[in-house]
């Protein structure tokens, strides 16, 4: 039997397991994918195993929904912080969470929200074939915030079928390890919509 918790942050949902005892078999990627499957499992965007760390309050061992290892996830690390505080009954206002992309500092805001310092964006990454590519008639630029993202600016998000374009970009041969995809519409100089 597996005891798990379901958390969500800004539209992403996660299965979280207390794995400080290291009993969850991380080698079984099929099991991870099945847990995250929305039709045959619990359903989630990813699996977070909360583990002990000698460098931080805890380690976020993160897996994508298909069972592959990921460096981290910004929304996931905020959920991991909330889970850690509830699990340990801690009243800390700042946490350090170790990830494969380094240690992240999470601030517990008043009102129950969490902020994370993601660090400076990285514009060259082993998963980027070049600085930009035109795919599906959209120019995508690449940035890593601990994991790779393809960001494409469009005139109107309403004219784009993200459920069609997203998987084509994510699984494009240029990205053998896959890539996160965001489409951005500029509303004003200070306001952007993102899908």
PLM region descriptions:
Residues 133-159:
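Internal active-site segments that recognize and position negatively charged phosphoryl groups
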Residues 74, 84, 125, 144-147:
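Contiguous hydrophobic segments
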Residues 120-139:
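Active-site glycine-rich loop that binds ribose-phosphate moieties when present
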Residues 112-119:
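Short, solvent-exposed secondary-structure boundary/capping segments
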Residues 1-111, 151-195:
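A glycine-rich beta-to-alpha transition motif near the start of alpha/beta enzyme domains, typified by
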